[in-house]
From Swiss-Prot:
Residues 221-240 are annotated as: Required for binding to WDR6. It comes from Mus musculus. InterPro entries: RNA_methyltr_E_TRM7, RNA_methyltr_RlmE, RNA_MeTrfase_FtsJ_dom, rRNA-MeTfrase_E, SAM-dependent_MTases_sf. Belongs to the class I-like SAM-binding methyltransferase superfamily. RNA methyltransferase RlmE family. TRM7 subfamily. One of its GO terms (molecular function) is S-adenosyl-L-methionine binding. One of its GO terms (biological process) is neurogenesis. It catalyses: cytidine(32)/guanosine(34) in tRNA + 2 S-adenosyl-L-methionine = 2'-O-methylcytidine(32)/2'-O-methylguanosine(34) in tRNA + 2 S-adenosyl-L-homocysteine + 2 H(+). Interacts with WDR6; the interaction is direct, and required for 2'-O-methylation of position 34 in substrate tRNAs. Its main location: cytoplasm. The gene is Ftsj1. This is tRNA (cytidine(32)/guanosine(34)-2'-O)-methyltransferase.
Length: 324
């Protein structure tokens, strides 16, 4: 597999590199903005779970590029610096992080809070959906500390069977909640984005990160709050219909007959967790799984032998009572 294979399989990955974006997800935020005008009148924006920084790049151009705009990016992982973006390496579940955000805004609340974070998927869909829901609630919780009344909140969701619970929780705090699917988001993915506009918390609501919304105390956090009894959350497809299909493979031949040239990623990851494994593989030191058909008699004899069974069993146990 050559280094151009992903450019063929994922046109948005290729376009992101050609346009200087750190990740293909930049197109998702741009297409959401085309539909909802998220950046209109925004002077202070917060990007939660920001690494590697593609959404922060978009915010810095759309908000920070206005001269008076300010952008704060927050992530647990280190992120390469971006011009016009204030970076905080911190935990979004900590009150100190919320205070630091407000401090950078000189005591003023944010107009827009976005979160494109997602946990490492396990392949167990129920577990992945649950973990994503908890991450969204953590982002919502810190948003209640830093977002101004009437502000906007955009966060990634997984449209699982319990997504209606998330909608109802978000609807308590926002006058408008929609589910949006950008064109650059693969059709094969259950990923979508909750676009929440008009921040309007219940009367008497006091944000409290010491009792986060994700601690399962629904009786005190949600069930006692008054809100709509039945709301249908609209589903909106974002992006021009003529835009590229994120699930389609495109040719590398460019328009006008120009020759394709490979473009490296704009910003390689900083100290990724797989870096050590790549080094071991490159040096031929990475352990390989030994398949049964590859085992010879001699190689089997060299493998570590299990402990003698008499050291593990009561000597009174008869052989016919041992079930392996």
């Amino acid at each position: 597999m050559g280094r151009t294979s992903k450019d063929k399989r994922d046109v948005y990955y290729r376009l992101a590199k050609e346009n200087g974006w750190r990740a293909r997800s930049a197109f998702k935020l741009l297409q959401l903005d085309e539909e909802f005008q998220l950046f209109k009148g925004v002077k202070r924006a917060v990007d939660l779970c920001a690494a590697p920084g593609s959404w922060s790049q978009v915010l810095s151009q759309k908000v920070g590029g206005q001269g008076s705009g300010q952008v704060v990016a927050v992530d647990l992982q280190a992120m390469a610096p971006l011009p016009g973006v204030i970076q905080i390496q911190g935990d979004i579940t900590q009150l100190s992080t919320a205070k630091e955000i407000i401090q950078h805004f000189e005591g003023c609340p944010a107009d827009l809070v976005v979160c494109d974070g997602a946990p490492d998927v396990t392949g167990l869909h129920d577990v992945d959906e649950y973990m994503q829901a908890q991450l969204l609630l953590a982002a919502l919780n810190i948003a209640t500390h830093v977002l101004k009344l009437g502000g906007c909140f955009v966060a990634k969701i997984f449209r699982g069977r319990d997504v209606t619970l998330l909608y109802s929780q978000l609807r308590i705090f926002f006058s408008s909640v929609l589910c949006a699917k950008p064109k650059s988001s693969r059709n094969s993915s259950i990923e979508a984005f909750a676009v929440c506009q008009g921040y309007d918390p219940p009367e008497g609501f006091i944000p409290d990160l010491t009792r986060p919304l994700l601690n399962h105390s629904y009786d005190t956090d949600f069930n006692q709050l008054d809100g709509p009894t039945r709301v249908i959350v609209p589903f909106v497809a974002c992006g021009d219909l003529s835009a590229y299909d994120s699930d389609r493979t495109y040719s590398l031949d460019l328009d006008g007959g120009s020759e394709y040239k490979y473009t490296p990623p704009t910003q390689p990851p900083i100290a990724p967790p797989y870096q050590e494994a790549c080094r071991l593989k490159k040096n031929g030191q990475l352990a390989k799984e030994l398949l049964p058909q590859e085992c010879s008699i001699n190689s089997v004899d060299k493998l570590p032998q299990p402990l003698a069974i008499h050291t593990l069993l009561d000597p009174k146990v008869e052989d016919n009572e041992i079930h392996c």
